[in-house]
Amino acid sequence: MGIQGGSVLFGLLLVLAVFCHSGHSLQCYNCPNPTTDCKTAINCSSGFDTCLIARAGLQVYNQCWKFANCNYNDISTLLKESELRYFCCKKDLCNFNEQLESGGTSLSEKTVVLLVTPLLAAAWCLHP
């Protein structure tokens, strides 16, 4: 590669470095104590890839969470609540009260699509 090719490659790498940033951290509403109207937003720490909102009676928990732990057993154990509703999501500031009020579930829409698509594909392939 000549000098001109090296300059073009360097320019492309520079443009990619400027416009592509890695390490975007998810923003979630996070209140250390249960509250009914959490408005405190934080950038989640590394390893926390999901926002959680959980309601146990009148207590509402908003925080960063690990998607791998987004299930009833882990949430109820870590929050020390035996009866709760919860919603996990992976978009910035998606863990607000209306998610639970509108019938939020434990799985995001994308997760359901990712789970159902292979099953439909398998059924299609097996269909005579």
UniProtKB/Swiss-Prot annotation:
Glycosylated residues (UniProt): N43
GO molecular function terms attached to this record: complement binding
Record keywords: Cell membrane, Disulfide bond, Glycoprotein, GPI-anchor, Lipoprotein, Membrane, Secreted, Signal
Domain UPAR/Ly6: 26-108
Signal peptide boundaries: 1-25
PTM text: N- and O-glycosylated.
SUPFAM superfamilies in alphabetical order: Snake toxin-like
Membrane topology: Lipid-anchor; GPI-anchor
GO cellular component: plasma membrane; side of membrane
Source organism, top-level taxon: Eukaryota
Listed PANTHER family: CD59 GLYCOPROTEIN (PTHR10036:SF24)
Function: Potent inhibitor of the complement membrane attack complex (MAC) action, which protects self-cells from damage during complement activation. Acts by binding to the beta-haipins of C8 (C8A and C8B) components of the assembling MAC, forming an intermolecular beta-sheet that prevents incorporation of the multiple copies of C9 required for complete formation of the osmolytic pore.
Subunit description: Interacts with T-cell surface antigen CD2.
Entry protein name: CD59 glycoprotein
